[in-house]
Every structure is written in structure tokens, then in C-alpha cells.
Amino acid sequence: MAYSKIRQPKLSDVIEQQLEFLILEGTLRPGEKLPPERELAKQFDVSRPSLREAIQRLEAKGLLLRRQGGGTFVQSSLWQSFSDPLVELLSDHPESQFDLLETRHALEGIAAYYAALRSTDEDKDRIRELHHAIELAQESGDLDAESEAVLQYQIAVTEAAHNVVLLHLLRCMEPMLAQNVRQNFELLYARREMLPLVSTHRTRIFEAIMAGKPEEAREASHRHLAFIEEIMLDRSREESRRERALRRLEQRKN
């Protein structure tokens, strides 16, 4: 009986696959700088030429970017599928924000569910840290800081779900999500009596994730976004009433 020769994988191929996996699962984040070549070769326990070959191939694939004298970075444009013009277009059509909220219902509910089910101690530490950052920003009345903390909190929850497709969907949506969160906070800061209720909703999501209760986390996420949607609808109705009143006033003048 003839046996085929077992081919050992090329070392640079193994390194390439490992780095690809770290990018895919989100361990290496967009824009993140890789350790220096010498240090990275030591961590992988490989030769520098093999590492260099793997990095060159990942650079050719568009996953890494090497800057002369500045190191090697994960491409920051990997998840920027929704371009600035599209974000601007959506902002010019307020009704699209309701479509985005519906999408957030689905994605954030799933993320909260699986974060409660799968989050590690390190994931929970990160989520806890960002939840506290949101509280501090709200206490100081810093709209910009609170909007950014909420965005980073949602990214951390999605990372804790350990679903690479879900994470990369969120990364693609990040510019739109950032704008939506910001607009929602502008509305909430104009109706400050609503802020404590929003905080209560978010705390329920946080506590369910920390307690490992996936169904409660998902339901709390849905209730939170439904509340935001209701506030947006109230504003839309108020604006419609104001426009009708102005039209009547103009008619009387004429």
C-alpha cells in the first residue's frame, strides 16, 4: 500500500492564519498597532523572516498596513463599509433613524443575550468599566463623553458575545451608530427628566449580563430601545403639531 507524504504546513502560513484569526475575532482591533517585529516573533516563538513573510501577505490582502518607521497596524478601514456620505444622507432623512433603531433592537438584543451567556471575567471587567464611565459622564452633564461611552459600551457588549459576524456587523455600522447615539442624547438632554429612566434601563441590561441571565438581558435591551423610540415619536408628533400651528398662523396673516 502506497502512503502519501505528510506535508508540514509552512511556518509563515501558520503565523498568517493565527494573525487572521486574531483580527477576525476582534482581539486585534481596527487601527491597533502590532507589537514590534522582534517582540511578536518572540511571542509566536518563530523566526523573524517567517513572521515578516506572513505580515507581507496580510498586507497584500489589505488586512495590515505597514508604515515606514512607524510599525504595523490593523487596517482601520476594514469595517468602514458605511461611508461618510451615506451617514450624512441618513442624517438628512430623520425617518431613517427609526429604521436604524429597529436594526439596533435586533443586533443589541442578540449581543446582550450572548454576552450574558458567554462573557469572560475580562469581558465583564471591560463592560463594568464602561458602564461606570457612562454614569460619570451623565453626572457631569457631558453629552459628548456620555455618547462616546455608550458607543464603546455597546462595542464591549458585542465583543463579549463572542460572535465574529455580529461584531463585524457592528463595526460596519459604527459611524451610523455613533451618529444615532449622539442624536438620541441631544434629544434626551433637551428632556433631562428622561435621563434617570434611560439609566435605569441600561442598568437592568448591565445587571442581567453580569448575572449571566441571557433572556433578561435581551428583554431589557428591547425595553430600553423601545423607550428611546417612544421619545423620538413624541418629538416627531410635537414637531408636526408645531408645523400645523405655524401653517394656521400664516393662513390667518394672509
UniProtKB/Swiss-Prot annotation:
Organism this protein belongs to: Salmonella typhimurium (strain LT2 / SGSC1412 / ATCC 700720)
Residue ranges forming the DNA-binding region read 37-56
Q: Outline what the protein does.
A: Transcriptional repressor for the pyruvate dehydrogenase complex genes aceEF and lpd.
UniProt lineage: Bacteria, Pseudomonadati, Pseudomonadota, Gammaproteobacteria, Enterobacterales
For the keyword Transcription, the answer is yes
A family per Pfam = GntR
Q: Which UniProt keywords apply?
A: DNA-binding, Repressor, Transcription, Transcription regulation
Q: Which GO terms describe its molecular function?
A: DNA binding; DNA-binding transcription factor activity
Q: What is this protein called?
A: Pyruvate dehydrogenase complex repressor
